[in-house]
Regions:
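Conserved N-terminal Rossmann-fold NAD(P)-binding element of oxidoreductases
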Residues: 9-14, 431
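NAD(P)-binding Rossmann-fold cofactor-contacting core
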Residues: 30-46
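Beta-strand->loop->alpha-helix junctions that form or flank phosphate-binding loops
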Residues: 36-37, 55-58, 94-98, 139-141, ...
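Nucleotide phosphate-binding/pyrophosphate-handling subdomain across enzymes
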Residues: 2-10, 18, 22-29, 250, ...
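Phosphate-binding loop of NTP-binding sites
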Residues: 2-7, 25-31, 48, 61-65, ...
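Short acidic low-complexity segments
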Residues: 53-66, 411-419
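C-terminal helical cap/extension that packs against the catalytic core
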Residues: 369-426
Length: 449
């Protein structure tokens, strides 16, 4: 994979956050990059602006036989006409995860896994290494605000490569990291794994991929087992622990101490919530293992701007604050809303939530109801299906009936702006992993007016 210049690479499902990062990587490496996605989006438009040709029609007549390699996302359906054409013409087809696996073996790599928190940790590690001057490449599962991108493309002199490790369809088992990080293991993707026990087993298989001279870093509460060198982090009973957590001057501040009582100093950041202190700890420990000076780590963390759609404060004035967040699992919702309450304890919280996947809504119906009941007002959108077909009896209306907050309603997409306007929110949060992000600019404009 390190000798790729001038190859012609086609991406099936180029508009996904992970696929677009790979597309940008190979494009900047000098490859001819083009691809297909089902729908146009702000991200695909940016790729086109960068010189990448994208088709929005599953039409084999748009393809040419000089394509050297096809990289596909697991979201592409098996009956895709373009996929079948590539198979018929015996053009090499590989999965995104397999390509990342090859790249992870080019140099020392840091792989960040977890059902929640992995994008933020990946982005923090990337920023801290970049700030310290390390020669590096990075693949992030979101748009990091410091670089306004989801990728950093280095060169053959890279000292380290950082990548987000996706547990969906066991993709992360293709990686060979020097440092592996596990942030969380909560039941999710049960349509793939069947039960939580299988999910835990898969995470431990990922950890086992860590090189023999490498290190495993993980949340001390997790059921991780490894014979590699390992370090844990948390608020208690861990190798590294956070102390004196507080918010001062709109910054989160905390100190770190080892289990032996050694103080590692004070840190501050623009992120909020205990979950983000945990995320910062994982990133700090990884960078320290890579011999980054603690002064650079401390300064870098203070300048980290966050990731788009991760507790993303989009608008704030004297009357209203608007936060957009990617949370789509009950535990993520709880953590995010807890952070919101911590910062704005007296404001009435209006939550707009778009459930993501019928299977996830089915598997965690009661947990979603409990988490969403934290809102004062709830505007619940219809379930975003993504790759799935509807499941009988699994609807937003069924979920709404289980939610205990007094003011709650179902809202269709074409009603959303009017409903928000009529609710006159003082603290508005939008959440979800579907297409709710497409409403964010319009909501910003509405609140500004």
């Amino acid at each position: 994979m390190n000798k790729v210049a001038k190859r012609k690479i086609y991406f099936l499902g180029i508009g996904g956050i992970g696929m677009s990062a790979l597309a940008r990587y190979f494009h900047k490496k000098g490859c001819v990059v083009l691809g297909y996605d089902k729908t146009e989006s702000p991200l695909t438009r940016k790729l086109e602006d960068e010189g990448i040709l994208i088709h929005y029609e599953d039409n084999p007549n748009l393809l040419s036989d000089d394509i050297d390699l096809v990289i596909m996302t697991p979201a592409i359906p098996k009956d895709s006409l373009q996929l079948q054409w590539f198979k018929d013409n015996k053009i090499r087809i590989t999965k995104r995860a397999e390509v990342l696996g090859e790249l992870s073996r080019l140099t020392k790599s840091v792989a960040v896994a977890g059902t929640h928190g992995k994008t933020t940790v990946t982005a923090i590690v990337t920023h801290l290494l970049n700030y310290s001057g390390k020669r590096m490449s990075a693949f992030i599962g979101g748009i990091a605000k410091n670089i306004n991108s989801n990728v950093i493309v280095g060169d053959e002199n890279d000292e380290v490569m950082v990548m987000e490790a996706d547990e969906f369809d066991r993709s992360f088992l293709h990686l060979s990291p020097y440092i592996s990080i596990v942030t969380s293991i909560d039941a999710d993707h049960l349509d793939i794994y069947g039960d939580e026990q299988e999910l835990v087993k898969s995470f431990n298989e990922f950890v086992a991929k860590t090189s023999e001279n490498g290190v495993v870093i993980y949340n001390h509460k997790l059921p991780v087992t490894t014979d590699r060198k390992h370090l844990t982090y948390g608020f208690e009973d861990a190798d590294v622990m956070a102390r004196n957590l507080r918010i001062e001057n709109a910054l989160t501040k905390f100190s770190l101490v080892t289990k032996e009582g050694l103080g590692l100093g004070e840190f501050e950041m623009r992120l909020y919530g205990k979950h983000n202190v945990m995320n910062a700890m994982a990133a700090i420990m990884a960078c320290f293992q890579l011999k980054i000076d603690m002064k650079d780590i401390r300064e870098g963390l203070a300048t980290f701007k966050g990731v788009q759609r991760r507790f993303d404060i989009r608008y704030k004035d004297d009357e209203v604050c608007y936060i957009d967040d990617y949370a789509h699992h009950p535990e993520e919702i709880k953590a995010s809303l807890s952070a919101v309450r911590e910062i704005f304890p007296t404001k009435e919280l209006t939550l707009v939530f778009q459930p993501h996947l019928f299977t996830r809504t089915r598997d965690f119906m009661d947990e979603f109801a409990d988490a969403l009941s934290q809102a004062d007002k709830l505007i619940l959108m219809e379930i975003y299906p993504a790759r799935e077909k509807p499941i009988s009896g699994i609807t937003s209306s069924v979920l709404l009936d289980k939610i205990s907050c007094k003011q709650k309603q179902i809202c269709q997409k074409d009603e959303l702006l009017d409903v928000i306007q009529s609710s006159r929110p003082e603290l508005l949060v939008t959440m979800g992993a579907g297409d709710i992000d497409r409403f964010v600019p319009s909501i910003e404009m509405l609140l500004q007016s």
